[in-house]
Design a protein with these regions (language model features):
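Hydrophobic cores of alpha-helical transmembrane segments in multi-pass integral membrane proteins
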Residues: 11-123, 139-164, 180-212, 218-279
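Glycine-rich, flexible loop/turn motifs
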Residues: 129-130, 173, 213-215
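Active-site glycine-rich loop that binds ribose-phosphate moieties when present
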Residues: 127-142
Length: 279
């Protein structure tokens, strides 16, 4: 009883710390984008890093409380997605030295985190899955979804900024956004992370299935949609480097590709796949 109360208190503490850090980070990024305060942007990045740390421990406490992986249900999967989305964005921010899009990314991170925390627990039994191989398979798969989601956000920013520039509606906020070329490169970087993650994650998934059933070719509709996602994003990277497709067309294709990812993560997982309900 005492342990259960302590675990509940820790979960509540990490929830509050994560929420406060993410909200503060969002405010910092907005201050940087709207007012151009450099210290505000740095504070946003710092609070995002602190939020990632608190969110990680929240996932860890959730796993301990459930005595299983933290993503065996929809809430856990969404929470992990939000954490990996924030992690991917912060990595991209540091790599490209550009933090002005943080104000657009943090609302999605907050939405996934809050959805996971406020949704009712899933009463479905956890799948008979365990082991390091399975854990890496799921984590890398959700990392790929998060990276593809980030590329979609960046592509939407690209399309919005391009439209404002063409309409000559240029204000201080637009000037603080990354250049169109940098947004394009950031989107491609995010897609590359997603492709590497989903490729390795898929291979690990086949290895795990072979160990579990002895039949690596056991059919699952998820295999087909995953192959389609891989082909779609490889096609995007190819066209994004073509002068005739670079820019707006490539960004539109990136948004369309993420619609396939959403279809895979929702419709295919929930209604067609036997072993990929939440990842």
């Amino acid at each position: 009883m005492l342990f259960a109360r302590l675990a509940g208190a820790m979960n509540h503490l990490f929830f509050l710390l994560t929420l406060a850090a993410y909200l503060g980070s969002f405010a910092g990024y907005v201050g940087y984008l709207v007012a151009g305060r450099e210290w505000s942007g740095r504070l946003g990045s710092l609070l995002l890093a602190l939020g990632l740390a608190a969110h990680y421990f929240a996932l860890l406490e959730r796993a301990r409380g459930l005595h299983t992986v933290p993503y065996h249900d929809l809430a856990g999967s969404m929470s992990l997605f939000g954490w990996l989305l924030a992690l991917t964005y912060l990595s991209l921010e540091l790599f490209h030295r550009q933090r002005s899009v943080g104000a657009f990314v943090l609302p999605f991170v907050l939405a996934f985190f809050l959805f996971a925390q406020l949704s009712p627990p899933d009463r479905l039994a956890a799948p008979p899955a365990a082991g390091v191989t399975f854990a890496f398979h799921v984590t890398l798969s959700i990392l790929a979804y998060a990276a593809f989601g980030l590329s979609c956000v960046l592509s939407l920013i690209y399309l919005g900024e391009q439209r404002l520039l063409h309409q000559h509606r240029v204000g201080d906020v637009v000037w603080r956004l990354p250049s169109l070329d940098l947004l394009d490169r950031m989107s491609q970087s995010s897609v590359l992370v997603g492709l590497i993650s989903i490729a390795i994650g898929t291979v690990l998934g086949f290895v795990w299935v072979d160990r579990l059933t002895g039949n690596v070719w056991r059919y699952d509709p998820k295999y087909v949609i995953t192959l389609l996602v891989l082909v779609a994003y490889v096609f995007y990277l190819r066209l994004a480097r073509n002068p005739g497709w670079r820019g707006a067309r490539a960004s539109q294709l990136c948004v369309f590709n993420f619609a396939i990812v959403i279809f895979s993560f929702t419709v295919v997982n929930l209604f067609f796949s036997r072993s990929h309900r939440y990842f």
